[in-house]
C-alpha cells in the first residue's frame, strides 16, 4: 500500500514538472510561431535562439509587486487563479501516457490513476474550470473583469454540452468509460475514422473551453482590456497563464487519447508517439490564433446553441442506432 502511494506521488511529481516546463515553453513557441507567420523575428535575444525567454518571463513575473486593487473580495480574488491552474492539472491524473513499463522488477502503468469512469471525471474536472473564470471576474470589482467572467462562464457552459455529447459517442462506440481501455481498443484502428463528426465537434468546442482564438471573447483586448485578467498581475497572472496553456495540453491529450489511439504507433516508443500527437494539436492551437479573426459574441453563442448542439445530438442518435441496434 505504501509502495503504491509512493509510486503515485512520484508519477504526480514527474507529470507536474513536465507540464510546467511544457507550458512555459509553449508561450515561447507560440510567440515564435506567430512571429514567423507575421514576418517578424520574435523573442530570440535571451539566450541561444531565445531559449531562456520563458525563464526571463518567469523571473519578471516573480519579482513583480504583490498588488491588490481596492474593494476586492480578497479570499476569492486570490483563490480564482489557483482554481484555474489546479483544475487543468487534475485532468492529467486520468490521462494514460503509455502502456506498462518494468522498473526494478515492478510493472508500472504510465498513468497516475486508472478510474473505471474516467470519461465522467474528465467532464467533471473540465466543468470546474468555469469557477476560476467567474470568480475572478466577480471578485475583482471591475466592470471589464465582470463582463469577461460572465462571457467566459456562458461560453464554457454552452460549449460543454456538445463536448459532452461528442465524448458520449466515444463511450457508445467502445462500451467503456475507462480511458486506458478506450486506448487499448484503438490498437488496430483509431476512433477518428469511425467517429469523425464527434472529433470535429470536440475539437471546435475545445477552443471555446480553453478561451482561445477565435473564441477568446472573455479576454478580448479591444473590448474588455484583458477581461477577467484585468486586475491580476505577477504570479497571480502567471497562474492564470499556466492554467490556460496546461488546459491546451489537456484538451490535446484528451483528443489524442479518445480519437487518435493514445500512445499507439509504429515501433516501441509509446510516450514519444503520445507526445508527438499532442504537440501537433498544440501547434494547431497556435496556428489558429495567428490566422483566424475573433467571433462576435452573438455569433459565438448562436453557433454553439443553433449549430453544434443540434449536430451533436443528431450524431449521438446515429451512433447509438448503429452501435446498439
Swiss-Prot record:
Q: Name one GO molecular function term.
A: NADH dehydrogenase activity
Catalytic activity, EC: 7.1.1.-
Any one GO cellular component localisation term in the record: plasma membrane
Domain of life of the native organism = Bacteria
Please give the chief subcellular localization of this protein.
Answer: membrane
Catalytic activity line of the entry:
a quinone + NADH + 5 H(+)(in) = a quinol + NAD(+) + 4 H(+)(out)
Q: What class of enzyme is it?
A: translocase
Q: Write the signal peptide boundaries.
A: none
The places in or outside the cell where this protein is found are: Cell inner membrane
| Record-stated family | Belongs to the complex I subunit 1 family.
Q: How does it assemble?
A: NDH-1 is composed of 14 different subunits. Subunits NuoA, H, J, K, L, M, N constitute the membrane sector of the complex.
The record describes the protein's role as: NDH-1 shuttles electrons from NADH, via FMN and iron-sulfur (Fe-S) centers, to quinones in the respiratory chain. The immediate electron acceptor for the enzyme in this species is believed to be ubiquinone. Couples the redox reaction to proton translocation (for every two electrons transferred, four hydrogen ions are translocated across the cytoplasmic membrane), and thus conserves the redox energy in a proton gradient. This subunit may bind ubiquinone.
Protein name (Swiss-Prot/TrEMBL): NADH-quinone oxidoreductase subunit H
Q: Which organism is it from?
A: Protochlamydia amoebophila (strain UWE25)
Amino acid at each position: 500500500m505504501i509502495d503504491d502511494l509512493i509510486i503515485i506521488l512520484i508519477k504526480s511529481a514527474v507529470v507536474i514538472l513536465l507540464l510546467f516546463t511544457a507550458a512555459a515553453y509553449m508561450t515561447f513557441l507560440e510567440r515564435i510561431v506567430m512571429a514567423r507567420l507575421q514576418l517578424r523575428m520574435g523573442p530570440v535575444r535571451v539566450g541561444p535562439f531565445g531559449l531562456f525567454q520563458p525563464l526571463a518571463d518567469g523571473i519578471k513575473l516573480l519579482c513583480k509587486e504583490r498588488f491588490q486593487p481596492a474593494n476586492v473580495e480578497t479570499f476569492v480574488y486570490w483563490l480564482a487563479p489557483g482554481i484555474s491552474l489546479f483544475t487543468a492539472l487534475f485532468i492529467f491524473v486520468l490521462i494514460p501516457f503509455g502502456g506498462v513499463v518494468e522498473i526494478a522488477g515492478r510493472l508500472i502503468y504510465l498513468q497516475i490513476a486508472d478510474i473505471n469512469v474516467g470519461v465522467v471525471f474528465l467532464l467533471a474536472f473540465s466543468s470546474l474550470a468555469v469557477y476560476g473564470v467567474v470568480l475572478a471576474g466577480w471578485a475583482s470589482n471591475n466592470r471589464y473583469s465582470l463582463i469577461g467572467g460572465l462571457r467566459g462562464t456562458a461560453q464554457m457552459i454552452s460549449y460543454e454540452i456538445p463536448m459532452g455529447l461528442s465524448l458520449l459517442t466515444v463511450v457508445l462506440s467502445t462500451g467503456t468509460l475507462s480511458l486506458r481501455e478506450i486506448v487499448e481498443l484503438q490498437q488496430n484502428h483509431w476512433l477518428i475514422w469511425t467517429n469523425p463528426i464527434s472529433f470535429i465537434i470536440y475539437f471546435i468546442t475545445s477552443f471555446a473551453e480553453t478561451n482561445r482564438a477565435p473564441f477568446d471573447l472573455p479576454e478580448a483586448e479591444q473590448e474588455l482590456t484583458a477581461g477577467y485578467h484585468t486586475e491580476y498581475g505577477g504570479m497571480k497572472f502567471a497562474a492564470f497563464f499556466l492554467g490556460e496553456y496546461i488546459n491546451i495540453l489537456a484538451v490535446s491529450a484528451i483528443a489524442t487519447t479518445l480519437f487518435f489511439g493514445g500512445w499507439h504507433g509504429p515501433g516501441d516508443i509509446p510516450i514519444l508517439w503520445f507526445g508527438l500527437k499532442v504537440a501537433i494539436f498544440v501547434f494547431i492551437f497556435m496556428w489558429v490564433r495567428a490566422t483566424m479573426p475573433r467571433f462576435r459574441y452573438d455569433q459565438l453563442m448562436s453557433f454553439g446553441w443553433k449549430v453544434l448542439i443540434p449536430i451533436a445530438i443528431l450524431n449521438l442518435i446515429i451512433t447509438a442506432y448503429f452501435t446498439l441496434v
